[in-house]
């Protein structure tokens, strides 16, 4: 009976959001909002008020970045973020990436996820920026 209780409790613990301090802030260091970039360019991620930890590491006050590319409607903030062509996961704790996008206007935004890719109970979401790819 004890094992059955554990089996029921574990999934809810895994699916639980983590808490982020109110002052936590995610931001894109570069490129700048409105910048024109080459088809291949580097995006540098910023985070203040929290630390970066790889996915799978359940350490309070930490998370890892997810880059939202051309996302008009945010995904569920209560479930693990899906990995798609528009939602890039950086579960290794990376703080930058090189993107290759087609010419035109694009939007970029960061969303911090906890150890199981779930956004924090008070989501740490950057401002959305726009870039123009040459």
Regions found by a protein language model. Give the residues of each.
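Short, compositionally biased P/S/T/A/G/V-rich stretches that sit at domain boundaries
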Residues: 17-38
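Contiguous beta-strand segments within globular domains
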Residues: 35-50
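A glycine-anchored, Pro-Gly-centered beta-turn/N-cap motif
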Residues: 39, 63, 102-104
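Short amphipathic, basic-aromatic surface patches that mediate peripheral association
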Residues: 46-57, 118
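Short coil-to-beta strand junction motifs in C2/discoidin
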Residues: 57-65, 125
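Short acidic/polar inter-strand loop motif in beta-rich domains
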Residues: 74-76, 113-124
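Short, solvent-exposed, Trp/other aromatic-anchored flexible loops in extracytoplasmic proteins
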Residues: 81-106, 111-114
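Short beta-strand elements
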Residues: 121-134
């Amino acid at each position: 009976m004890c094992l059955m209780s554990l089996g029921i409790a574990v999934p809810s613990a895994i699916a639980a959001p983590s808490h982020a301090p109110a002052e936590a802030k995610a931001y894109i260091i570069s490129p700048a909002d409105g910048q024109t970039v080459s088809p291949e360019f580097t995006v540098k991620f910023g985070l203040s008020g929290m630390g970066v930890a790889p996915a799978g590491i359940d350490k309070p006050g930490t998370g890892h970045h997810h880059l939202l590319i051309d996302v008009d409607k945010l995904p569920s903030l209560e479930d693990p973020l899906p990995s798609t062509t528009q939602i890039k996961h950086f579960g290794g704790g990376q703080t930058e990436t090189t993107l290759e996008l087609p010419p035109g206007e694009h939007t970029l935004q960061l969303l911090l996820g906890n150890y199981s890719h779930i956004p924090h109970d008070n989501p740490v979401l950057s401002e959305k920026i726009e870039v123009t790819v040459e």
